[in-house]
């Protein structure tokens, strides 16, 4: 596995060891999405690659290139090194946010839909995932076909489920934490497709060797997009009394998003519902959401 700093490996191994014994099955190397060093060496002796790294925080960055540059350049570095090393297949973690169309109306996401990065409603994160994934497919299309590198792409929604360490500070889990602690006094009129981290991990592994996965995009998450109101009601009915069920008007959220970076990062979803066609993943991997 790759990390940005080898100083993190001790904690990672400790967290993994709570669940399985990783000895002899896990090695670490230090890689940076924005630097060339180490990529070719990291791929030596490998047959398959999972490229899951991409920067994300809940706030919209002042400069969208803080997301876009490492997402695109990191993907290209991984692909070039994989091709040079003779890797059989790469499985790339993209996102449902690369499938939003114009992000200006509710729609059903599927394998053929792409986010229009020119739309004013598209966040920097959505742009970064869209551009990174498109650059990957372009690389595959343009490569030397004599010994082709295969590609499969996984497109999850916001990721929930158990963490290795028990830490709930991640972007998606942090949203539920804020709901439970009453730190979200008014709810946005927005809906999200939820992805279980265990499903995502399983599909990534299955996509490595499943012949039918080559050249495909797979949405891994719920077919139905759940509104914040629905999530709040579920939490409320399960005893979380601090959860607010008050709804903020869309016009107010969109207006405030021009000045608030937390809200601006949600513009893709405010006032819209994106249901998803997960049938390709269900059929290919015999999987149920």
Regions found by a protein language model. Give the residues of each.
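C-terminal amphipathic/interface module of NAD(P)-dependent oxidoreductases
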Residues: 1, 209, 240-246, 262-289
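NAD(P)H-binding glycine-rich loop region in Rossmannoid oxidoreductase-like domains
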Residues: 6-8, 17-73
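Conserved Rossmann-fold NAD(P)-dependent oxidoreductase catalytic core, especially the SDR/UDP-sugar
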Residues: 51, 55, 60-125, 144
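Active-site Tyr-X1-5-Lys
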Residues: 119-151
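Glycine/proline-rich active-site loop of Rossmann-fold NAD(P)-dependent oxidoreductases
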Residues: 145-147, 161-174, 207-218
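Glycine-rich Rossmann NAD(P)(H)-binding loop
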Residues: 161, 187-190, 218-226, 236, ...
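Mid/C-terminal beta-alpha module of Rossmann-like enzyme folds, strongest
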Residues: 203-263
């Amino acid at each position: 596995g790759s990390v940005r700093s080898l100083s993190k490996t001790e904690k990672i191994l400790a967290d993994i060891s709570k669940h399985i014994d990783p000895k002899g099955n896990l090695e670490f190397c230090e890689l940076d999405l924005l630097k060339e060093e180490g990529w070719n060496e990291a791929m030596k002796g490998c047959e398959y690659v999972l490229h899951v790294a991409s920067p994300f925080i809940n706030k919209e960055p002042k400069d969208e290139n803080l997301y876009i540059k490492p997402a695109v350049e990191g993907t290209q570095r991984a692909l070039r090194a994989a091709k040079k090393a003779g890797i059989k297949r790469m499985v790339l973690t993209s996102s449902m946010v690369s499938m939003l169309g114009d992000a200006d109306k509710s729609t059903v996401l599927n394998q053929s839909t792409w986010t229009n990065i020119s739309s004013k409603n598209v966040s920097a994160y959505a742009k970064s995932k869209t551009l990174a994934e498109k650059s990957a497919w372009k690389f595959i299309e343009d490569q030397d076909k004599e010994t082709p590198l295969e590609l499969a792409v996984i497109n999850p929604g916001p990721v929930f489920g158990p963490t290795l360490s028990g830490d709930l500070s991640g972007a998606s889990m942090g949203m539920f934490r804020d709901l439970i602690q009453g730190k979200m006094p008014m709810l946005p009129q927005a809906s999200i497709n939820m992805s279980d981290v265990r499903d995502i991990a399983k599909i990534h592994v299955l996509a490595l060797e499943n012949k039918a996965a080559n050249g495909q995009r797979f949405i891994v998450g719920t077919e139905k997009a759940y509104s914040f109101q629905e999530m709040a009601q579920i939490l409320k009915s399960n005893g979380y009394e601090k959860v607010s069920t008050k709804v903020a008007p869309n016009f107010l959220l969109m207006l405030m998003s021009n000045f608030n970076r937390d809200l601006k990062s949600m513009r893709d979803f405010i006032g819209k519902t994106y249901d998803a066609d997960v049938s390709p993943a269900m059929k290919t991997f015999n999987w149920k959401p």
